[in-house]
Amino acid sequence: MYPYLKKGNRLPTVTAAQILLNRALRRGETIAVDGDFGRKTREAVINFQQNHHLNDDGIIGKNTWAALVRGQGLQVIDTVDVAEVADIGYEDQDIRDAGGNPIVNHGMSGGLRVVLDQILARGQLGRVVLLRFHGHGSPGNMGLSTGTRSDVPSSEFTADYFRIDRFRNFLARLAPLFCPFGSVEFHGCRVGGGQAGKKFVEGFAKVLKVPATAGKQTQYGGGRSTFRFEGAIRTAFPGGKTLKAWSASQAEAGQMSVYR
């Protein structure tokens, strides 16, 4: 439902937050849009929080994010793999408690198509600021409706799928859902690790035309952990851009694109 962001984060979602902050700030008070949550971004967050009578801790959490996106017409879509009994009522419940309505996926064959169809049904054109996948993972692999099993056919994302034209073409149907400064995140364990993880995020960035981020280490769920990454991450950008270059390219579009 929201990304948990604080000083030190370097993410496409920070870029989105900076754009939204600039929309709310007075002329002359705007901050650089670079994806780097540094001192000036924290100061801008505190200023925004004080102006909106929020807890001025300099952290973007549930309430601050809700205030930033109010009236913007933007969507955060979460999809959660609950194929394991232990996963039910965990991250999916965290998202509900934060006011979200996650797409919940139980163990099934062919889950990949089912999940993507649900995203297409829920997403609105040009309005998704964050698409986030929760579940089990491994380097270059993200479970969608598999739990920890590896023998459920077509129920996961894997780097090898980008060799298949049919998969790329089907996945590309999601691209029009994203707003100009949208992104996709994979919160499975070590999905971004190694060469397989590099191929994985690069494949998504190329096909979806938005940044793709995955954790390189073990990821946790529960409470705030459901809404943030643990440890090192890997992000790929469309056209091979850097975070700074991609962020700069979105700054002007972000000022112009207000969704009602």
Give, region by region, the residue ranges found by the protein language model.
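A domain-level signal for caspase-like cysteine endopeptidase catalytic cores
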Residues: G73-G123
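Structural recognition of the beta-strand scaffold that forms the well-ordered cores
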Residues: L20, I59, Q75-E84, V129-H134, ...
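Catalytic cores of nucleophile-dependent amide-cleaving enzymes
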Residues: F133-H134, P139-G223
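Caspase-like cysteine protease fold
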Residues: A214-R260
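Acidic, Ser/Thr/Pro/Gly-enriched interdomain connector segments
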Residues: M1-G35
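Extended, structured, electrostatic nucleic-acid-contact surfaces
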Residues: L21-A32, E43-D56
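Intrinsically disordered, low-complexity Ser/Thr-rich linker and spacer segments
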Residues: Y2, A67-I77
